[in-house]
Design a protein with these regions (language model features):
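Short S/T/G/P-rich N-terminal loop/turn motif that feeds into the first structured element of a domain
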Residues: 1-58, 67-74, 101-104
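C-terminal structural segments of small proteins and small subunits
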Residues: 69-90, 94
Length: 104
């Protein structure tokens, strides 16, 4: 099993919306990927509940699981993922990620 974890810091304002509105939209988009991309086995999306404006905090986190590395690769090449990435790239300041094999 492959776990894909991504954290984003969002711009204060982008695409005509506030950070919070874009975080909510991003959550809906990411959760919707599971419906359209069969390789995703599990997906969780969280919005940081800490309102502290600390530079150390991140706004949105994605945790998604894939059965194999090939499934993860197929996910990254899927048109729904590419469409989501267009929105993501328009609203983020920074991104950090880690992909790892889970022992199950």
């Amino acid at each position: 099993m492959i776990r894909h974890v991504v954290m984003w810091k969002l711009k204060e304002e982008a695409e005509g919306a506030s950070r919070q509105k874009n975080a909510n939209k991003l959550k809906l988009i990411l959760e919707g990927l599971k419906t359209n991309i069969e390789e995703i086995k599990n997906v969780q999306v969280g919005i940081n509940i800490n309102s502290d404006e600390s530079d150390e905090g991140w706004d949105v986190v994605l945790i998604s699981d894939f059965k194999t590395e090939l499934d993860y690769t197929m996910y990254t090449r899927n048109e729904h993922h590419k469409k989501a990435m267009k929105f993501i790239n328009a609203v983020i300041e920074e991104r950090r990620f880690v992909d790892y094999k889970m022992d199950i």
